[in-house]
């Protein structure tokens, strides 16, 4: 169930971590480049004010940049922490290893 919205969650992160909107934008920059997503000051301002909600791409970027779950950032009553991501290296190990369950247990 959705209890809050993205604006409330962003404001909470900003307060808890002593961040400004420009700091959030700076944190997103490397991920925006990596995933070819454009985000600017106006976007962050509108998300923080509640005027608009981020689309799926921008929500993903905000989630990884702030190290929070996208569902939490959207306002759902779920844990704030991101689930552990499986890296390309982990996937390579899975396919190269005969003992699949051992590799999965170590992820």
Cite the ranges covered by each PLM segment:
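DNA major-groove recognition helix of helix-turn-helix/homeodomain DNA-binding modules
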Residues: 55-72
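Helix-turn-helix DNA-binding elements, focusing on the entry/boundary residues of the two helices
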Residues: 21, 41, 56-59
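Recognition helix of helix-turn-helix/homeodomain-like DNA-binding domains
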Residues: 30-54, 76-78
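A short, Lys/Arg-rich alpha-helix, primarily the initiator
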Residues: 1-30, 34
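Interfacial/linker helices and their anchor residues that mediate assembly or domain coupling
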Residues: 79-107
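Conserved hydrophobic/aromatic packing and binding residues within compact polymer-binding modules
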Residues: 10, 24-25, 44-47, 73
């Amino acid at each position: 169930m959705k209890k809050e919205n993205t604006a409330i969650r962003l404001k909470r992160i900003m307060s808890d971590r002593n961040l400004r909107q420009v700091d959030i934008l700076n944190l997103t920059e490397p991920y925006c480049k990596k995933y070819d997503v454009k985000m600017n000051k106006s976007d962050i301002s509108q998300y923080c004010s509640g005027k608009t909600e981020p689309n799926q791409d921008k929500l993903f970027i905000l989630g990884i940049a702030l190290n929070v779950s996208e569902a939490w950032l959207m306002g759902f009553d779920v844990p704030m922490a991101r689930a552990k991501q499986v890296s390309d290296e982990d996937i390579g190990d899975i396919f190269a290893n005969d003992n699949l369950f051992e590799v999965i247990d170590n992820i």
